[in-house]
C-alpha cells in the first residue's frame, strides 16, 4: 500500500468563471496596463473576449467595483472606468500588506532569484527593438509631464520587457506574477525628482549592460536594483519601532 505522505497533492479548488475574469482584469489594472479613467470594454464585448455570459462578466465587474478599482457611470458618457488610487486606497493597501508581511518577504526572495537570471538570459537574447523600447521608457520617465501613475506604468513595462527578452515564457509569467504582488507596495513609494533620478540611473545601468550583451553584469545590476527596491519598500512601510524589533 502506498504511503500518502509521499505525495504532494493539492486539494481541488473550483474557481468560478467570474473569479477567473476578475483576476485577469485586476492584474491588468495592478500592472498599469489600464490606467485611471481608461474605459473598459462593454459587458457584451468582455463576454465575447472571455467567452462567458454577460451575467458572469457582471459578477466580475461588481467584485472589482467593491474593491474600489472601477466605477460604473451612467448617461451619454457612461460605461465602466478605472478609478485613480486615492489616499484611502493607499491606507487600505498598506494595512493589507502589513497583515501579511511574511508573504511580501517571500515575494522579495522569489524576485531576487528570478529577475536577475532573466536579465542574464536577456543580455544574450535581447533584440535591437527591445533595447529601443527600454531606452524610450527611461526617456519618458524623466519628462517633466510624467505623472506618478505613468512613471509606475513605465517601470512595469521596463521590467516586463526584460523578462520577455529572456526568451523564456515561464520566466516572463513569473515576473508578471511578482509584479502583481509588489506593485501595490511600490504604489506607496514617494514620487519626486530624487526618485525619478535614482530610477533613471539604475535603469540606465541595466540598459547599458544589456546593450553590451554582458550577462553577468546584467544579472548583478538587476540584483542590486531589486535589493534597493526591497529596502525602500521596507523602510517606507515598516515603522522604526517595528524595524528595531525585527533586528533584535
Where are these regions (language model features)?
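Conserved amphipathic alpha-helical segments that form helical-bundle/coiled-coil interaction surfaces
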Residues: 107-188, 198-205, 217-231
